[in-house]
Structure formats: C-alpha cells, structure tokens
Amino acid sequence: MSTSAVLFLLLAVFAAGASAATFNIKNNCGSTIWPAGIPVGGGFELGSGQTSSINVPAGTQAGRIWARTGCSFNGGSGSCQTGDCGGQLSCSLSGQPPATLAEFTIGGGSTQDFYDISVIDGFNLAMDFSCSTGDALQCRDPSCPPPQAYQHPNDVATHACSGNNNYQITFCP
C-alpha cells in the first residue's frame, strides 16, 4: 500500500472518532431568556418552558453557552441586563459578567469531549449541564462547589464524555 493511501486511511479513522454534538437548551425560568453561544450558536430568544437545539461541529474548542436576561432587541441590536455581548442578538463575543457558563470542547481528546460549568465570570442563573453518558453537573447558586463548577482559574472541574454524544443544558432547573 502506498504512503499516501496509508495517510488517507489514518486521517479517515481519526476524523471518524469525533463528530458533531447537539446541545438541547431548556428554559425552566419563569421568564424569557436569550441563550447565546460562541464560537457557534449566536443567540436567540427562548420563552419560558421552551426548548431549542444548536449543533456544534466536531473540533470546536473552548465553546461557551450562557443565558442572557432582561434583554430588549429591535432587529438584531439591543441590550441585556446580564450576559450582554456587545448589544447584539447573535453573539460573536463572550457575554459580559455576570453570566453562568456552560463550557465545552467537542472532540478535543480525539474520541472524548470535555465540559464544565463556570462561575468565574459571575452567576446569573442556575444551570444543569450534562452529556448523555457523563456526569450531570448542577450549579444552583453563586457558591456552587467544585467539582460542580469552576469558581477560580485553578479549579479542576472539567469532566469528560465519550465522543458522539449529545448535551442537555437547563436554565433554572
């Protein structure tokens, strides 16, 4: 077998190990929230009791999803009381504190994903975050304990999930 054929097969095997993930986002809060995500997910309105999904491609590094509150938008511009991202409905920047963060890397360990909840940027809403085959993380108040959430940059609250899984984020569980 030629060197180029072997290289092609190896690349195909590694690429097959990681795939996109679907993030189901549920709003259990008593009012509308505006979930946002970078580098994918942008932003959207999510009424109380509603669920929406975003697809995150394999290879996404340092992704974040958070809920903005107290927002008012006219077209694609406006402002939010918490988690605002430059006054835009569709975020391309991280939200302003305070914002409870769901953080993730999809396919970062070849066949593993990594995820955590972070309150380093402050706390604005309670959150549950889980993958279909991993630990269920819960952060219900600003002092949620490690290993449930990052509170300081040196915490070790990252969890692993086998690749090819989907995720559930619930705000106000």
Curated annotation (Swiss-Prot):
Key words of the record: Pathogenesis-related protein, Plant defense, Signal
Signal peptide (residue range): 1-20
InterPro entries named among the record's database cross-references: Osmotin/thaumatin-like_sf, Thaumatin, Thaumatin_CS
UniProt-listed SMART domains: THN
GO BP: defense response
Entry keyword annotation includes Signal: yes
Record-stated family: Belongs to the thaumatin family.
Protein's recorded name: Pathogenesis-related protein 1A/1B
Organism per entry: Hordeum vulgare (Barley)
Taxonomic placement: Eukaryota, Viridiplantae, Streptophyta, Embryophyta, Tracheophyta
